[in-house]
Amino acid sequence: QAEELGRKLAEEQPGIDEILYSPLVRAAETARHISEMTGIPMRMEPRLKEQNFGRFESTPRNGEEFMEAKSHFLDHYDGGETMMHLCQRVYNLLDDVKAESDHKTYLLVAHNGISRIVQSYFYDMTNEEFAHFGIKNCEIREYYF
């Protein structure tokens, strides 16, 4: 999927100036494939790391207990990160990108939870929409400041 996206971006030349990527392995490998195929420079951005789910790490994301816990935005998931802290982290990144962008175009390579936060930064969402928002692997969404 990453190689297919890299080929597509290399052919279409959409004017991406820099790739910002999560330090987690899958996102970093995806960013590397895209960078190698397109020549777009890449930079690791720790604020794109997926949410720390505490005791729910490595458990199914569609499990009943996790889905219930996910609706409590202020809870720490027993040792994890609250949804509010995650939002603050990603919103701060987006504010920084906006301030430094000077009309640059960035490709963010991250995770489904991060995409949900990015979507909520640009568009109002209900709790239900927020909880059920998701993207496919290597899907591209465009946002404009």
Summary of predicted features, one role per range:
Residues 1-40, 81:
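Active-site-proximal alpha-helix that buttresses catalytic centers in soluble enzyme cores
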Residues 3-10, 87, 91-99:
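Generic structural signal for well-ordered alpha-helical scaffold segments
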Residues 21-22, 88, 109-110:
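Short beta-strand scaffold positions
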Residues 25, 48-49, 113:
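Catalytic metal-binding/acid-base residues of hydrolase active sites
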Residues 28, 91-145:
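Active-site-adjacent alpha-helix immediately C-terminal to a catalytic or transition-state-stabilizing loop
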Residues 35-91, 144:
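Phosphate-handling substructures
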